[in-house]
Amino acid sequence: MCIRDRVGTDLQAILTFADKDGEPIIAKVGLSLVSVDNARKNLAEEVKDFNFDAVCAAARNDWEQALSSITVEGGGTDDLKNFYTAIYHAMVVPNVVSDVNGEYRRHNMQIGQLPKGKMQYSTFSLWDTFRAWNPLMTLIDTALVNNMVNSYLDIYDASGELPIWPLSAAETGTMIGYHSVSVIADAYLKGIRGCLLYTSPSPRDGATS
């Protein structure tokens, strides 16, 4: 089944299935900010042999590994639940907005191409995160920090400003401040420098203009 493009207001869709009572309906969904073709590629690459139970098991394993990045000792069961629930919440964002072929939508609406192994991120609530969440990431996930800083710089290159509160491929302008500057500086001072900032003074100029 393929749903063609529809343009309008107050659009609705009704889907019917020839399922039996109690029979599960499984939907495979691919997403892309670039194109429908890329959405199909993402789906084909990320979920090659679709089996719902296998996907659930793989997701559980991924979360086990992610949450194991920090080991704590002491405290009771409730303390551990609170701690690891907080770590889980800390790993929900940012979101990867690049596709499996490295293409992504830039903030000037053009299509960018990332080097192999790099990812473009969005959903940076910097007003909320610069005090604690971003410093935490410099301790537990330096690869993510490098990709995030590169994402900030790409946003600057495409739009002329470092991000404030970007979502998908656009700046929402929500909240005040220019907190991406302090996040970049924190990463640099901690020796996390696997990004493009240090060949260009432009973000510094943007912060002082």
Where do the model's predicted regions map?
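Beta-sandwich/jelly-roll carbohydrate-recognition scaffolds of carbohydrate-active enzymes
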Residues: 4-121, 154
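Secondary-structure capping and boundary motifs in well-ordered enzyme cores
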Residues: 78-79, 119-128, 173-180
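Alpha-helical support elements that line or immediately flank enzyme active sites
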Residues: 85-98, 122-145, 185-191
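Conserved small/polar residues in nucleotide/adenosyl-binding loops
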Residues: 1-5, 198-203
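Second-shell loop/turn segments in exported
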Residues: 70-74, 122, 134-138, 170-171
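Helix-terminus loop motifs that line ligand-binding clefts
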Residues: 104-108, 112-114, 144-190
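Ala/Thr-enriched low-complexity intrinsically disordered regions
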Residues: 207-208
